[in-house]
């Protein structure tokens, strides 16, 4: 085979790949909106509950699967990057609250209401699948810890707001039509050790350092304008 034929074949192969490569790196600009449902988990925490009706130090809490939902409004810049404002609510059921061998509560929940600004790097291609990764920073509008005692006595509720919470995400988007897409991703949010004051049931009391770092999976739909 001559050098000319090899060179010609290489040029033809490279030329045939250029349109696909160019398309893989571009996407249309525009606004999009998303709505999603969420399954979430958080780890166990040991914290202190102060106040006249507080349990004191060494309180151990465990939580079950959380459920939540949310949505975002975003903008694609046409170069693989997007920015979005997200709102999220989730609640995790309390499964155990103990101090040593003593059961303190039989019911309750740990819930949050958060607004975030996310930056997203999308990897568009000629296929229907578009992987993406992102990071964001949120403001906790409210995080609530509700405790319902195992024995007689009123419930106690604690609330906090204003904490910053970073977020990481990784997922994929699937094009159903030119405007509708299915999305699924995993997200890790870190609010850290929360300090919350009593809202009801323990006047002047507080909880110190129950952690709130949920890991979640989202499934939703997205509409592009």
Whereabouts are the PLM-identified features?
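Cleavable N-terminal export/targeting peptides
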Residues: 1-29
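Gram-negative (and chloroplast) outer-membrane scaffold detector with strong preference
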Residues: 25-30, 39-41, 72-150, 211-225
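Short, solvent-exposed beta-strand-terminating loops
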Residues: 36-46, 187, 191-192
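Outer-membrane beta-barrel translocator domains and adjoining extracellular loop/strand segments
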Residues: 45-54, 95-102, 143-153, 195-203
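N-terminal, post-signal-peptide region of Sec/Tat-exported proteins
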Residues: 48-87
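Predominantly the C-terminal beta-signal and adjacent terminal strand-loop region
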Residues: 92, 96, 168, 174-225
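Hydrophobic alpha-helical segments of small multi-pass membrane proteins
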Residues: 115-117, 133-139, 162-172, 187
């Amino acid at each position: 085979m001559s050098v000319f034929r090899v060179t010609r074949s290489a040029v033809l192969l490279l030329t045939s790949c250029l349109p696909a490569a160019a398309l893989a790196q571009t996407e249309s600009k525009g606004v999009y909106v998303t709505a999603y449902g969420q399954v979430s988990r958080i780890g166990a925490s040991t914290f202190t509950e102060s106040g006249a009706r507080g349990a004191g130090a060494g309180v151990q809490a465990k939580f079950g699967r959380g459920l939540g939902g949310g949505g975002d409004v975003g903008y694609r810049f046409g170069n693989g990057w997007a920015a979005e404002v997200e709102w999220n609510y989730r609640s995790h059921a309390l499964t155990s609250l103990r101090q040593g061998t003593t059961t303190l509560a039989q019911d309750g929940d740990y819930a949050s209401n958060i607004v975030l600004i996310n930056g997203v790097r999308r990897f568009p291609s000629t296929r229907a699948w578009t992987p993406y990764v992102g990071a964001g920073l949120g403001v906790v509008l409210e995080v609530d810890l509700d405790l319902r005692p195992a024995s007689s006595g009123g419930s106690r509720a604690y609330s906090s707001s204003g904490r910053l919470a970073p977020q990481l995400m990784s997922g994929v988007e699937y094009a159903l039509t030119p405007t509708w897409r299915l999305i699924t991703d995993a997200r890790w949010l870190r609010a850290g050790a929360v300090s919350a004051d009593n809202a009801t049931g323990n006047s002047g009391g507080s909880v110190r350092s129950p952690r709130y770092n949920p890991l979640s999976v989202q499934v939703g739909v997205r509409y592009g304008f």
